[in-house]
């Protein structure tokens, strides 16, 4: 009798559907690879400055630290910027259009958020000494990216 219980257990472990179901329970759900959109930047121009009012929301949608995204925009636009944590706004010391900000945010997403292997946005940006690595939570791929 004990032999038949072991045989049933062994057969269950070899069943493809059972193993697949067990695997899906262990793998975290992914956001998907469909077209993912970040919030449209709410821009106000004050003199020679540009204020992105919903910058914190944009950074949260990108799943990245707002200071990191701010540093990227600062570098790409070759200007000084300050992030106000209390209000969640980014102040750029240059006049820039919504279209240009959107283009740089899309480029940031392509380079530092979206997995180049599977297209998922379920990624983490890891810093290893002086290098940055983009690690995908969906497929497990690791890709070096240029430092910000």
UniProtKB/Swiss-Prot annotation:
Known role: eIF-2 functions in the early steps of protein synthesis by forming a ternary complex with GTP and initiator tRNA.
GO molecular function: translation initiation factor activity
Family classification: Belongs to the eIF-2-beta/eIF-5 family.
Entry protein name: Translation initiation factor 2 subunit beta
Pfam families in the record: eIF-5_eIF-2B (PF01873)
Keywords, ordered alphabetically: Initiation factor, Protein biosynthesis
Subunit structure: Heterotrimer composed of an alpha, a beta and a gamma chain.
Keyword Protein biosynthesis belongs to the record: yes
Taxonomic placement: Archaea, Thermoproteota, Thermoprotei, Desulfurococcales, Desulfurococcaceae
Species name: Aeropyrum pernix (strain ATCC 700893 / DSM 11879 / JCM 9820 / NBRC 100138 / K1)
